[in-house]
């Protein structure tokens, strides 16, 4: 899209990257890669409840074990699909490993309070803020991983969607 923005009729200053869960990992990784490669310039990154830390050492990754919802075991299986045994992951595979979060695009994100990735996301958001990156983040009480996809008609899901759309509208209207 960035390389062919003229052909596509796309404003190269209004590009965002977004993803859910493992896709949230990819969105954060693409933001890091775009920064490190000096392009494309992203106006927003939207890693929603991203799987950001392959170490699975946070309190929430230890305490969310109910197999009726996304839990620690699911996280481990997910990471095992991405990382080979003995492989030392990079920041592009596990964005929480990044030493430097400065110079990244603004972030919008949300997560459920009962998501095993809650604490790794909270830590990542805090590190972004400490690096001077604008961050808008929301933790939805009583909600689990992918809650807005599981129960899209719920008021909390509608609120999560509207907050996301509003963040994208704001990012795309700047310029």
Predicted ranges, named:
Residues 1-175:
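Alpha/beta-hydrolase superfamily serine-hydrolase fold, recognizing
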């Amino acid at each position: 899209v960035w390389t062919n923005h003229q052909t596509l009729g796309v404003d190269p200053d209004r590009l965002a990257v977004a993803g859910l869960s493992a896709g949230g990992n990819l969105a954060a990784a693409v933001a890091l890669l775009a920064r490190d490669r000096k392009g494309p310039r992203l106006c927003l990154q939207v890693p929603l409840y991203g799987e950001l830390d392959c170490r699975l050492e946070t309190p929430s990754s230890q305490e969310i074990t109910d197999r009726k919802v996304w839990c620690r075991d699911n996280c481990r299986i997910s990471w095992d699909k991405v990382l080979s045994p003995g492989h030392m992951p990079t920041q592009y595979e596990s964005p929480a490993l990044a030493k430097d979060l400065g110079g990244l695009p603004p972030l919008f994100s949300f997560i459920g309070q009962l998501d095993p990735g809650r604490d790794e996301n909270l830590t990542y958001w805090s590190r972004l803020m400490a690096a001077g990156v604008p961050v808008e983040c929301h933790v939805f009480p009583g909600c689990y991983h992918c809650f807005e996809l599981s129960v899209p008609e719920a008021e909390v899901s509608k609120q999560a969607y509207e907050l996301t759309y509003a963040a994208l509208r704001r990012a795309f209207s700047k310029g």
